[in-house]
Amino acid sequence: MKPAFDLSEYQRRLDLVRKSMSEQDLDALVIGDPANMNWLTGFDAWSFYVPQVMLVLHDHAPVWLGRQMDAGAVYLTTYLSEESVRPYSEDLVQRDDVHPMEAIGDEIRKFDLSGKRVGFESDTYFFSFKAVERLQSTLSEVHWQDADRLVNWCRLIKSDAEVEVMRVAAQIASNVQQVAREHIAPGVRQCDLVAKILEAGTSGINGSGGDLPALCPLVMAGEAAATAHPMWTDIPFEKNQTVALELGGAHKRYNAGLARTFQLGSGPQKVYDTANAVTEG
């Protein structure tokens, strides 16, 4: 395995983050968003269900701090060296008397940030209130600064390398919708159609494999069409039913979404009027 992009691309991203940190007068930044860790270093593992962060400094490569059993994925998917991999012990997981963020805080202390301004992501999944509280109480000697979405803004404008990966994701998304079109029919169960969709999304296209998309396949059929994000069921599609499918493709963690509406037979005039209006733009 190797990182999804070459080192120069990751260096470009790190330079952007450090520039934004300087603009906000930050000496360091603690990242809790798995997507931001992935964008910055390539780190890719299903490890975000336990406490983990990435520390960004001005004079040191990014530092990953997480569960010991997940440290191997850092070497497999990033350019980081052993000096930048700081795991905590397995016996700290799911304990009431101690929290992994305390060990992470002790490790961060080694970078001599006392009295320094340290940013953190305040509104992100998988970086819980307790995790933030334990980290900040452990490192009470630093000045904490809300730096939410700092990395996200750096991600906004895509590089040429990123656009190429997104094009592959879009091709996968287009193929996924084509597969859905070929298999959707009255009598087919929603779950069986989704099985075809997931197979197509994972197999990818033209030799490029697919990843798990950020959004699972959404099937809006029958009563479920009255809401925005219903999960699929084992209910068969019906004749003359209007069905909306919100699908997508993913490649190297880059996503492309594509929504389509199908009419399984005859539909009310309002459906055709809406389709004509959409076609006209």
Specify the residue positions occupied by each region the protein language model found.
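Active-site neighborhoods and metal-handling regions in enzymes and metal-associated proteins
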Residues: 1-281
